[in-house]
Amino acid sequence: MLREAWTLAIETLSWMEMRGLSEPLAFAKTVKQLGIDDPDALRFARVLVFETVRRKNFIDAFINEAVRPSRIDHFGLGLQAFLRLFVYSTRFSKDWSKPDLEEAETVV
């Protein structure tokens, strides 16, 4: 379930960046493309995408600071999406000051 949700979220964010699609349209397109039908995976991916997009500017600033002198927009779309989702899941959905290394290993 976790792998499907992350795959769906990464692909959705990539479609949004590449084609400028809205979140609902990109999500629906990705669900159809990947053929994911697990309701838990769909629900979790939807939350990941929505919350990541909502905080995108702050997340990008955080990532840009971490990868300086490079910038997030210098990476491929899939890596950009993964980094944004990873920062959201490790910094926003949990206590900001305590990185969860076990979860990081599970996601990767």
Task: Give residue spans per PLM region.
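Class I Rossmann-like S-adenosyl-L-methionine
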Residues: M1-V108
